[in-house]
């Protein structure tokens, strides 16, 4: 799971912004304070 989260962080909003779900997930991670970062 952490590997997926890390890849999302590396991709950023520009990389996953192509899909609403991915963008929402990425924003949700940052709202949580990015505990995996």
UniProtKB/Swiss-Prot annotation:
InterPro entries: P-loop_NTPase (IPR027417). It comes from the Viruses. This is Uncharacterized protein A56.5. The gene is HA. Belongs to the poxviridae A56.5 protein family.
């Amino acid at each position: 799971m952490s590997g997926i989260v890390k890849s999302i962080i590396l991709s950023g909003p520009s990389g996953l912004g192509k899909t609403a779900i991915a963008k929402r997930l990425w924003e949700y991670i940052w709202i949580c304070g990015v505990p995996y970062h």
